[in-house]
Amino acid sequence: MTIQRILGMIAVSLLAVIAYLFFDISHRLEKARSEDPLVWVSDIEAFAERGVGEPESLLFVGSSSIRFWGELARDMTPVPVINRGFGGSKIGDVVYYADTLFQADNPRAIVIFVGTNDMTPQ
């Protein structure tokens, strides 16, 4: 295999990754700008499938600040956590899905961080 062919394959792979990321970001922005809470139904169904979590957990609910808190479990050690962040969500979305989002087995505390997307211009 020649170096040119390898470079060509790398270039095609990079273009595919860039196209995927562009589509993914565009899709997320579209969801975040939507006033329809039903755009989040797949995210909420995934939370419901995971169940109520460990008893006495800290329950975190909110937007991308919660969703992308990669070290949440480590930062809250030794207390177990439940992460129910869905990026781009607004206050109305959390209220709409409250029955599912706030299902937990006797949570120690509930942390809610949502609202910054409500201030985003359309």
Where are each of the predicted segments found?
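N-terminal secretory targeting modules
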Residues: 1-60, 70, 74
